[in-house]
């Protein structure tokens, strides 16, 4: 377990995830030496801002500057670095928890309300159900390819790329993070003491959507999950 809680600059992200000489690789090696274990799984939690820069999704370090393309940290670079690290025989599963808002107000935004989504004209039209009076529009969920990780990486994202990621009104973190922590403490468990990827996502997704619909009505937040093995056990409760 280790954390970075101060301002993260572009050089920090470069130094952390460099697959050959980076902090992460060194930390893996030292952790295994200390624990005596032969392998470990990696779990990353990141809370911060993102945007679209030159057509791709990027993380915004503290020193991000539109005039300097190297001050951004592309998601595809994060993924490629993690794939290289995963080639280490000591590294098993990699799981990301990304409480990231890709619509930072300082950059171009791509916020879309559910009612503004354009249907694919080639898609088969389904008969719409009549909404009850006062019933909120159900957001259309499509997994955004722009943030899709390689198949061997499981990634939980706080929202879709066309949505705002909200802070919790009463806590010092995001609504996604709040329910992530509650889920890991046991609220996501179905009673067998094993919290799977799917259980955790279902719990987070339901509660984040319910909370943001109440608070923000037509601009809800819908968490996203990318996983090739949703039944994998993430955490075992005592």
Predicted regions and their residues:
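Signal peptide-proximal N-terminal region
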Residues: 1-8
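Extracellular S/T/G-rich loop segment that most often corresponds to the catalytic His/Ser-adjacent loop
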Residues: 94-171, 177
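Caspase-like cysteine protease fold
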Residues: 187-238
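Caspase-like (clan CD) cysteine peptidase catalytic core
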Residues: 19-47, 51-111, 193, 199
């Amino acid at each position: 377990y280790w954390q970075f809680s101060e301002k993260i600059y572009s050089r920090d992200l470069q130094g952390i995830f460099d697959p050959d000489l980076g902090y992460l690789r060194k930390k893996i090696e030292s952790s295994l030496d200390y624990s005596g274990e032969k392998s470990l799984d990696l779990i990353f939690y990141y809370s911060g801002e993102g945007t679209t820069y030159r057509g791709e999704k990027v993380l915004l370090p503290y020193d991000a500057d539109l005039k300097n393309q190297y001050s951004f940290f592309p998601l595809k670079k994060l993924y490629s670095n993690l794939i290289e690290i995963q080639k280490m025989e000591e590294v098993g599963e990699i799981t990301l928890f990304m409480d990231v808002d890709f619509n930072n107000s300082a950059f171009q935004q791509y916020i879309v309300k559910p009612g503004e989504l354009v249907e694919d004209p080639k898609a088969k039209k389904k008969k719409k159900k009549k909404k009850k009076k006062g019933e909120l529009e159900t957001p259309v969920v499509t997994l955004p390819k722009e943030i899709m990780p390689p198949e061997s990486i499981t990634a939980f994202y706080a929202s879709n790329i066309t949505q705002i990621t909200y802070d919790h009104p009463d806590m010092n973190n995001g609504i996604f993070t709040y329910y992530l922590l509650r889920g890991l403490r046991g609220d996501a468990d179905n009673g067998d003491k094993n919290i799977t990827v799917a259980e955790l996502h279902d719990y987070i997704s339901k509660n984040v959507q319910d909370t943001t619909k109440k608070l923000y009505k037509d601009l809800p937040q819908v968490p996203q999950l990318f996983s090739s093995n949703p039944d994998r056990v993430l955490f075992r409760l005592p």
